Amino acid sequence: ASRRGRRGAEHDARPELRPDVSTLLDVDREYRSKAASGALRTIAPRRFNPGKQAWLPVLHTERTPWAFTALYSNTARADELGTTGDWVVIYFERDGREGQCTVVTERSGPRAGQRVVRGREAEDP
């Protein structure tokens, strides 16, 4: 699925239009486990990769009725904070509706050290 045109879809609050937090955290767990074991295909990101090396693992998976693509965040902010190997961006699609979210390790508060879906911290997994 194309990443274009996804902006804004992740902010739609109707639950049927976005995966629940527990599903997203399960995709995050699968991605980080397979990435750590070297079981995923890698791609060469365009940004912050002057040598054009294929180092970024990519997961394509499904949890009916959702299709997911997960990869580590390769943004300037993630690079600056040293969280490239922690922040996981998950793209999702269902019935033509697309969106994305970011899963991170919470650094403070009652959920410090836990994986959370950024922007949906108040939702129980």
Predicted regions and their residues:
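Helix-hairpin-helix
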Residues: 1-7
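Structure-specific DNA junction-binding interface
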Residues: 8-125
